[in-house]
């Protein structure tokens, strides 16, 4: 769940509304609490974060608060060892649900013209988990990666299912373009 946080800029005059997620990793033997990067609160952003200006607030009110900065899958947490594979994939699933809910809202509100929607989930999982399915990858760990050997393939299957669902919701004579900014291959 998102936790609203407030940063006082000028005491009693000005503050910044933000949000963060907290993930209790461990209590003992060492206390470990992960805090997501601080995000502008889309319900009350300090500055415009969407066009039109009020759209982020509308989307947040319709679907819930959401990530407003960086890569929500938080690849840096995995790279730096803050997340293990399981933590990362839990984060991926949470972000995926958030994005899907937003897309459903956007698609249901769409009345014509051009709609572009970016799903970064597959890209981020491919960057971070390709090693799990590639025994020749220099970062491959046969024990730690074994449960995640299908992580990339599972994202493709999910994307394919999602495209099918989307096609079923589109009116006749609508063109759907699915594209990628790049592909992936072994190390």
Q: What are the residue ranges of the model-derived segments?
A:
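His/Asp/Glu-rich, glycine-adjacent segments
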Residues: 1-142
């Amino acid at each position: 769940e998102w936790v609203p946080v407030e940063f006082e800029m000028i005491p009693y005059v000005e503050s910044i509304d933000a949000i963060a997620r907290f993930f209790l990793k461990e209590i003992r033997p060492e206390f470990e609490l992960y805090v997501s990067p601080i995000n502008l609160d889309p319900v009350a952003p300090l500055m415009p974060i969407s066009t039109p200006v009020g759209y982020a607030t509308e989307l947040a009110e319709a679907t819930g608060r959401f990530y407003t900065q960086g890569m929500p899958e938080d690849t840096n947490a995995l790279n730096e060892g803050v997340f293990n594979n399981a933590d990362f994939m839990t984060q991926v699933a949470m972000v995926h649900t958030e994005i899907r809910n937003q897309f459903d809202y956007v698609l249901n509100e769409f009345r014509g013209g051009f709609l572009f929607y970016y799903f970064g989930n597959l890209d981020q999982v491919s960057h971070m988990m390709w090693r799990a399915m590639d025994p020749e990858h220099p970062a491959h760990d046969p024990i730690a990666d074994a449960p995640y050997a299908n992580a990339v393939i599972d994202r493709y299957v999910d994307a394919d299912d999602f495209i099918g669902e989307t096609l079923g919701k589109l009116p006749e004579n609508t063109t759907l373009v699915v594209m990628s900014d790049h592909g992936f291959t072994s190390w």
